[in-house]
Amino acid sequence: MTNLRKTHPLMKIINHSFIDLPAPSNISAWWNFGSLLGVCLIIQILTGLFLAMHYTSDTLTAFSSVAHICRDVNYGWLIRNLHANGASMFFMCLFLHVGRGIYYGSYLYKETWNIGVILLLTVMATAFVGYVLPWGQMSFWGATVITNLLSAIPYIGTSLVEWIWGGFSVDKATLTRFFALHFILPFIITALVIVHLLFLHETGSNNPSGINPNSDKIPFHPYYTIKDALGLILLLLPLLTLALFSPDLLGDPDNFSPANPLNTPPHIKPEWYFLFAYAILRSIPNKLGGVLALLASILVLLIIPLLHTANQRSMMFRPVSQTLFWILAANLITLTWIGGQPVEQPFIIIGQLALYLYFLLILVLMPLAGLFENYMLEPKW
């Protein structure tokens, strides 16, 4: 009798995706983040579902309902802490996953890469609307400041902002619709993830060398299932440590005060994973310019495949490109730091320099490095 896993219509899909999938024999730990992101998504959906059972999306009771979850619901504090810190882990894995894609040339699988960029934008949108829900000071003012950016759009800007708000300011209508969006978006993300995997399995995984791995493949199970299990343990360790020992470490103290439209916090800033984008937004003195730079900082990922000039796919054997890649990584860390600082010198000029360097590296220096490396590898005799 043929194995059910190879004949049953549903089991066959699972089998071809996670069990008998031919995988390159040399993929490193950098390839673990895809499965870790899947686990993060599952954790966020499950914890979010249980939080939604006790949360109320009304301006009068939202803040109290979160306090109620933490105080009165069985293990509510744990569910909330896992959800809040799970978002940080999600973004940590996302940034490393994107970085891996840039370093090893995975962006040359254009469909997979483009769906991935759309996923990144969708996850960022989900995190933003989710941050508004506890209805603390930073939730309220963060929502006000970021939605207000749309008013920079010529002609329709103001009407668009009021349409999103559902009134003339961030209020009950805004909170209710943000809750609805925060509930539905993870399921849209799940659908996009399936499409992402569908495109990936059309081509098979890339590998650190960037060379076609078809001559040397191994089955996904047991080799990479056990490797992913180790990655999962190493992900859960910091997540549980954060959630159980210092759950508020990455949060903002201002969010422990209920939202007050009459009192603006001294420094409005988002969660750490948005600080790089916030720094880019603030680095341009013009409102519309800042919004365009903010959009460009993420959408620039879409044109990275078009800027690939090197004859080799991966940066593994390209030292000049490697150096520029790590400068880019340091630059993003600098932007993250600047995003959390007040708008004063020397932070303003550092932020502006980091912004220019960010686009210079991606759009000019890295493509030039690829051409230079091609030239250096050509035989000169």
From Swiss-Prot:
Q: Name one Pfam family in it.
A: Cytochrom_B_C
Entry's transmembrane regions: 33-53, 77-98, 113-133, 178-198, 226-246, 288-308, 320-340, 347-367
InterPro entries, sorted: Cyt_b/b6_C, Cyt_b/b6_C_sf, Cyt_b/b6_N, Cytb/b6-like_sf, Cytochrome_b, Cytochrome_b_C_euk/bac, Cytochrome_b_N_euk/bac, Di-haem_cyt_TM
- Can you supply one Gene Ontology CC term for this chain's record? respiratory chain complex III
Tell me which Gene3D superfamilies the record gives.
Cytochrome Bc1 Complex, Chain C (1.20.810.10)
Q: Where does heme b b562 bind?
A: 83, 182
Indicate which residues the UniProt annotation says bind heme b b566: 97, 196
Q: How is the cofactor bound?
A: Binds 2 heme b groups non-covalently.
The entry sums up its family as follows: Belongs to the cytochrome b family.
* Assembly and oligomerization: The cytochrome bc1 complex contains 11 subunits: 3 respiratory subunits (MT-CYB, CYC1 and UQCRFS1), 2 core proteins (UQCRC1 and UQCRC2) and 6 low-molecular weight proteins (UQCRH/QCR6, UQCRB/QCR7, UQCRQ/QCR8, UQCR10/QCR9, UQCR11/QCR10 and a cleavage product of UQCRFS1). This cytochrome bc1 complex then forms a dimer.
Q: Which PANTHER family match?
A: CYTOCHROME B
Q: What does this protein do?
A: Component of the ubiquinol-cytochrome c reductase complex (complex III or cytochrome b-c1 complex) that is part of the mitochondrial respiratory chain. The b-c1 complex mediates electron transfer from ubiquinol to cytochrome c. Contributes to the generation of a proton gradient across the mitochondrial membrane that is then used for ATP synthesis.
Name this protein carries in UniProt: Cytochrome b
